[in-house]
Structures are given as structure tokens and as C-alpha cells.
């Protein structure tokens, strides 16, 4: 009986005061911000393999920029694609950049244009600056493409559907 009362008091006190427990994603962001890339990588990797698009995007950034891991554009593309496939706008923009530059993938302006279009359509109102930057990248890419290539990229973007990680 005494144990039950203690548990009830503990539950009530936790409900009243709230739990100040940071999420693994918050811990990863804090580690990254302070330059502790090994910890950020470990925490993001754990979440990424579970299908967390933000963590997948973060791993892409880390491989792209050699932060806590050796620079590996193919690995960056792998993680950007996992997040982009789920509709992550920043990952879509970065994946478009990788295709435009041929980093980690064969250069492909049609796919670059497609990913830029998708990102532009998914950025929120508070991400207007990112939308504009991505729009400029798309326009630069389009300037190297034929009208048929642009039409193909637009068709691919229209037909694209997000995938949920399993």
C-alpha cells in the first residue's frame, strides 16, 4: 500500500511539474551546434535508420561537409534521398544540387530540376529565403536544358509521391 501511494505521488508530481527530458533529436542538434560531430552522428544515425527524415537529412549534411565523418558524396546522396523521398524539402533541394553538380551521382539536369521543383513546392512560408535560393538554382539548371528536358522534369515532379520509411 505504501509503495502504491509513493508511485501515485510520483506520477502526480511529474504531471504537475512536467518532464524536462530532451529528445534524441534535440540532443543531436545540441551536439552538432557545439561541434561534437561524433555524438551528433551517433544520435542522428540511430534515428535515421528508424526512418526519421530530419536525422537522415542531417547525416547527408555531415557526409556532404565532412563533419565527424570522411567526406563521401555518395553517402550524402544516399541519406539526402531517404529524407527527400519522404518529402523533406531541404533534402530535396540538396539532392537537386548534387544532381546538378554531379556530386555522388552522375550529373543529371532533369533529376536536378525535378528535385528543385519538389523542394520549392514543399518549403513553408517561413522558409521563403530557401525557396528563393532553390528557385535560382532551378533556373540556372533550366538554362542548360532543352524544352523537352524541362517538360520531363516537370512531369516527374508532378508524378512524384512521398514514400514512408518502413
Question: At which residue positions do the language-model features occur?
Answer:
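Bacterial N-terminal signal peptides
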Residues: 9-17
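Short helix-capping/linker turns of helical repeat alpha-solenoids
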Residues: 31-36, 44, 49-52, 65-67, ...
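Hydrophobic face of amphipathic alpha-helices that form TPR/SEL1-like repeat modules
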Residues: 24-31, 43-47, 58-65, 94-101, ...
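Bacterial N-terminal signal peptides that target proteins for export
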Residues: 1-9
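Terminal, low-structured helical/coil segments at or just beyond the last alpha-helical repeat
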Residues: 128-166
Amino acid at each position: 500500500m505504501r509503495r502504491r501511494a509513493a508511485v501515485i505521488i510520483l506520477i502526480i508530481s511529474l504531471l504537475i511539474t512536467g518532464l524536462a527530458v530532451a529528445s534524441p533529436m534535440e540532443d543531436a542538434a545540441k551536439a552538432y551546434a557545439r561541434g561534437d560531430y561524433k555524438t551528433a552522428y551517433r544520435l542522428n544515425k540511430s534515428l535515421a535508420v528508424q526512418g526519421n527524415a530530419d536525422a537522415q537529412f542531417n547525416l547527408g549534411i555531415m557526409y556532404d561537409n565532412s563533419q565527424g565523418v570522411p567526406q563521401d558524396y555518395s553517402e550524402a546522396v544516399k541519406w539526402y534521398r531517404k529524407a527527400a523521398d519522404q518529402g523533406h524539402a531541404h533534402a530535396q533541394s540538396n539532392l537537386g544540387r548534387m544532381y546538378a553538380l554531379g556530386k555522388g551521382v552522375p550529373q543529371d539536369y532533369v533529376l536536378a530540376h525535378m528535385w528543385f521543383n519538389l523542394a520549392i513546392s514543399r518549403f513553408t512560408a517561413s522558409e521563403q529565403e530557401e525557396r528563393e535560393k532553390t528557385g535560382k538554382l532551378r533556373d540556372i539548371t533550366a538554362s542548360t536544358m532543352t524544352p523537352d528536358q524541362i517538360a520531363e522534369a516537370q512531369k516527374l515532379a508532378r508524378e512524384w509521391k512521398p514514400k514512408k520509411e518502413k
